[in-house]
Amino acid sequence: MELKQLITFITAAEHVNFTLTAKMLNYAQSSVTSQIKSLEEEIGTPLFERLGKRLILTEAGKTFKSYAQKIIALTEEAKMATNQVRETTGTLKIGATESQCTYRLPPIIKEFKQAFPQVKLIFKPYISNEQAKEQLLQGQLDITFILDVNRMEDALHVESLIQDEIKMVAANDHPFPADLPVTLKDLQNETLLLTEDGCSYRTLFENNLHDSGIYPNKLEFVSIEAIKQCVMAGLGIGILPEMTVKDDIAAGRMKELNWQSDCPVFTQLAWHKDKWMSAPLKAFIDLTRKTFK
């Protein structure tokens, strides 16, 4: 028993005319006759009585009509319920760094969860932008936040949200004055506290150092919070996004050195160009745009 057979039967039962039914449903009349015959064979009793050219709904047909209407109504209700669940549940796998999860995303997450409480959010850290982009290409992430320069990507949609300043910070008692410019040459004998290899702003900064023939000592950390603690302990100079250190600078826990990055980086949102946009994913993107803009 197929849904289309039930729809054909209901239409025929309401108009008691196979020719009109065929015209209304865009079927050949033979198709209508065949569908009704299949139903009658499956049920085991005639649904229509044919008296010459007249078509009469049998008592069995009248009884079956009420059930057929219920089946069709329940089918539509099931479709609507399923679509509603599909649109408001599920899982979003989001790539983000520690600093983005800590300083950028909490207000977005809060508002999103209020709108989509049944959608599960999984935030996955990554070592480098290239790793995050590869995970998008492989379908391991639905969307990712990256911190990078503006560049074109063949298979990805990359949208810059906000420019991020990169700051050079040191302990308050570091000998570098806060008001005098710091040059790359000044860093030759310093210890730099850096994020993991593959971080976009670290790569840009180190390229500038190497182009100038400067190779300072360096300590590498997985955690930005660890770098900040080491900066405040006087273990070296940190190169970090402004969002991660502005509160510490304002509170006097460390000082900003007079240095300007010559290559702007941006918080960006990226996803595969062929990614199917579910309602939760589209809402997350729209909310992120609204928050940053």
Swiss-Prot record:
Q: Which CDD domains match?
A: PBP2_LTTR_substrate
An annotated GO BP: regulation of DNA-templated transcription
User: Which residues, as ranges, make up the DNA-binding region of this protein?
Assistant: 18-37
Pfam families reported in the protein's UniProt record:
HTH_1, LysR_substrate
Where this protein primarily resides, as one coarse class?
cytoplasm
Q: Which InterPro entries match?
A: LysR_subst-bd (IPR005119), Tscrpt_reg_HTH_LysR (IPR000847), WH-like_DNA-bd_sf (IPR036388), WH_DNA-bd_sf (IPR036390)
Please provide, alphabetically and separated by semicolons, the GO molecular function terms listed in this UniProt record. Answer: DNA-binding transcription factor activity; transcription cis-regulatory region binding
Q: Which PROSITE patterns match?
A: HTH_LYSR (PS50931)
Ranges where the HTH lysR-type domain occurs? 1-58
Q: Which key words are in the record?
A: Cytoplasm, DNA-binding, Transcription, Transcription regulation
Any one annotated GO CC term: cytoplasm
Belongs to which family?
Belongs to the LysR transcriptional regulatory family.
**Which named protein is this?**
Uncharacterized HTH-type transcriptional regulator YwqM
